[in-house]
């Protein structure tokens, strides 16, 4: 790790031109081994069949030795094909799977270097304090609280995918100037495309860049989304500028952007220049806000429904002409905020209208004034959460708690710890809900499922098990969230979690959405 840190501290321009040699460094594969195969807080662990960690480290050294050989990648793909069609061999399968997994994970770590350096330098240049808080998912809801109450319409956008793999490589060309590294990426993507088109006839057959190689594909997808968001901001700024200038001046500005090669505006301007001055003049809206997480985005505006429809069809043309992606109209829904609840980041969000009457006294005359205030409201999607719990075998589809038979081989402390961790994570994530009744129901399901699992392990009933050990066994870890909140708020504050249903708390340390919450 120290060697990688020393490399990162070098000149940024050199790193962009010399990323390829990192593929031959042992510490890169060791880092990929720790993050990819042993699991981390961001990625699920991948099982290495029949080998422990020490054996895996030995295989890492063997991989580095083999990668120096000529035509190693081609032979790796051929081995994968032979395992699929000629006959299954456990050893050949393992080495092929392990090597492809390690190379892809290491490739993902290396390709993230220029972006991570640019991100850190940006925050240091802007002197943004506590910029880590901006990574929190809950920070999005604080933004929505401030902005959505003043807007009229919202568009739910499902970003189209996939796009052509060659476009992904072209997107990275403006950030990475290492030509051999880009050629290697192109080789991997084309091999993945060819192998992915074949039928899988064996249960354990895993090929290069299968779905287990999530880190690289997430990076490529984020690069694609960043590209279209960058151009969307460009269009947005031009639409605001258009009414202040003539079409001729605007075309002059597009020629200026056409000269900026590293921003990849050239092709975009050539395609869109013909209709920019005809379409963007009616897209001006100074009150427009955009929020995205993963493949879903929200575009809110204070404009009219006609304006939102124009933006909708503009997005379709933009995706089609620039990214060569044909998308369907159902991927963008336009709704009025006053009577619409949208699902985003594990919450059901809506605008609550509060009607009130104010008596106004002027001299001897008095009259009533009806006022309407809007408030951003978030609630727990109970039905979605019950569906996730049912899929994870904690309850039935109707919400009836059941035992988890797979966990009965664990110790009692491990079972309690697993259920308690799930419950605390859900309570922590949904602390911003204005109504806690639904969250109490979810906690009740997990609590009773834990009791049924323990009773099944000891071949007893839930009532007998709780009578013998006491109900405090389950109370001990389920109330940890409430104990923490009682320390934050003084006793004089009328905040009691079980009594109040309107208090909301947003945390700035949540950087990953829980799998039970993510229904997309």
Curated annotation (Swiss-Prot):
GO terms for biological process: mRNA processing; RNA splicing; tRNA processing. The keyword Protease does not apply. Pfam families: Intron_maturas2, MatK_N. InterPro entries: Domain_X, Maturase_MatK, Maturase_MatK_N. GO terms for cellular component: chloroplast. It is found in: Plastid, Chloroplast. The keyword Chloroplast applies. Keywords: Chloroplast, mRNA processing, Plastid, RNA-binding, tRNA processing. It comes from the Eukaryota. Usually encoded in the trnK tRNA gene intron. Probably assists in splicing its own and other chloroplast group II introns. This is Maturase K. It comes from Liriope muscari. The lineage of its organism: Eukaryota, Viridiplantae, Streptophyta, Embryophyta, Tracheophyta. The gene is matK.
